[in-house]
């Protein structure tokens, strides 16, 4: 049996794509193995959000070549879509696929075996108008929760972002296809599904009848055995009253939202071509917390965007302190060639970016500790993801690390178990 190894860089959408491609190989009789193992085929699913992502992608390609110089090396994902010729020039690369036509990956690999010629299968992503179906069946995922992509592409064109050029226009998945996949995942034992997309909040705008994200959630709530539905990243301006009402009234809809802020300064938000003001973002948070007590809010923030002075960064830091996020994914601005921000004046030095990221991460840790302390004495459940040193560990409904001491009752990975939060211990809330 031929073996295939996968590695993934970047976002949850990329992770879904990898799981789906793994499933295609499994269906054709290939055996998945660890990426560090010697394999017949290596698939590197790349990221292009930052220069670091592209550099890591190149490193992983070369690592695969060193591990087995006779293997077929397949490179896919956003970096492959953006720079196919550069990737094809890397020694050992046999097949380059971008962010479409991945449903043909096995066919293309088998074509390599007969032609022994490098294949560049990257096509113009802007010409793809419909969602590429690569459904999951459950056996291709080795995690406690399942990520399910329901939307692809983005039309926002934030001034710092390369993704619209690598993922193309908005493309949504049919509600029936989403529900069928969710049912298969539940039948396979998954109790939590995370809905993901490049521009999740714009789900359905191009479909007949314009079904929205709330309609998808409502449909999934009819599935017996699905105990948790969680949203991936969603833009604040796309959190509809219907979604808020569902989260406020439906226990299975997790009380956690990841709402990218990107900057806490109106001047920087405008330069980023974001579609909200700071006051609008804050007002949404106030309304959400009023309607959904105990809501956990996490975010993304870019440090050192062009023109971000010390004073403007201080505005962002003060905003973060005021809102109290439970996690901040802070990262330094990365200049992406071809985006408006790449040619803006007043680029910020790397050392300054690094310092600002550290300050933001510090505030994220403080926000988490405050939120976790407020959970003490309250009921909580975790989805078990691992067993380590006598503890079951996982995430609560609010996406807080939790743990339960292993006792007489044996639990399995993927089980949801609960009790009362008795303490906060480092990064965990302890439940008994």
Where are these regions (language model features)?
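Residue-level signal for the nucleotide or nucleotide-sugar donor/cofactor binding architecture
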Residues: 100, 173, 211, 238, ...
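Radical SAM/AdoMet-radical enzyme domain recognition
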Residues: 187, 214-215, 219-223, 228-229, ...
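Terminal RNA-binding accessory module
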Residues: 343-432
């Amino acid at each position: 049996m031929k073996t295939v190894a996968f590695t993934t860089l970047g976002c949850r959408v990329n992770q879904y794509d990898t799981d789906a491609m793994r499933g295609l190989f499994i269906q054709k009789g290939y055996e998945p193995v660890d990426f560090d193992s010697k394999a017949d085929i290596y698939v590197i699913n790349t990221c292009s959000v930052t220069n670091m992502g592209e550099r890591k992608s190149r490193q992983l390609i070369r690592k695969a070549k060193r591990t087995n110089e006779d293997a077929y090396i397949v490179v896919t994902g956003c970096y492959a879509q953006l720079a196919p010729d550069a990737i094809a020039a890397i020694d050992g690369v046999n097949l380059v696929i971008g962010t479409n036509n991945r449903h043909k990956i096995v066919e293309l690999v088998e074509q390599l075996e007969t032609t022994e010629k490098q294949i560049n299968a990257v096509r113009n992503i802007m010409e793809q108008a419909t969602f590429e179906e690569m459904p999951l069946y459950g056996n291709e995922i080795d995690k406690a929760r399942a990520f399910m992509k329901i939307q692809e592409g983005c039309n926002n064109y934030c001034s710092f972002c390369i993704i619209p050029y690598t993922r193309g226009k908005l493309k949504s998945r049919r509600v029936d296809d989403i529900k069928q996949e969710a049912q298969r995942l539940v039948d396979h034992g998954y109790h939590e599904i995370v809905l993901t997309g490049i521009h999740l909040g714009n789900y359905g705008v191009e479909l007949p009848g314009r079904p929205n994200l709330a309609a998808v959630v409502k449909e999934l709530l009819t599935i017996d055995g699905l105990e948790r539905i969680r949203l991936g990243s969603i833009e604040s301006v796309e959190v509809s009253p219907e979604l808020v009402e569902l989260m406020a009234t439906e226990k299975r809809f997790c009380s956690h939202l990841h709402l990218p802020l990107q900057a806490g300064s109106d001047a920087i938000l405008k330069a980023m071509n974001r579609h909200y003001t700071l006051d609008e973002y804050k007002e949404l948070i106030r309304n959400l917390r009023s309607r959904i007590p105990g809501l956990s809010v996490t975010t993304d923030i870019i440090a050192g965007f062009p023109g971000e002075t010390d004073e403007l960064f201080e505005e962002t830091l003060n905003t973060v302190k005021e809102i109290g996020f439970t996690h901040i994914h802070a990262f330094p601005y990365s200049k992406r060639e071809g985006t408006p921000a790449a040619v803006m004046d007043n680029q910020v030095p790397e050392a300054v970016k690094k310092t600002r990221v550290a300050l933001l991460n510090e505030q994220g840790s403080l926000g988490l500790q405050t939120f976790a302390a407020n959970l003490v004495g309250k009921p909580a459940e975790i989805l078990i993801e691992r067993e380590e040193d006598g503890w079951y560990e996982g995430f609560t409904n609010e996406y807080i690390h939790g743990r339960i001491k292993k006792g007489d009752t044996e639990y399995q990975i993927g089980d949801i178990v609960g009790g009362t939060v008795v303490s906060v211990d480092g990064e965990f809330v302890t439940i008994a």
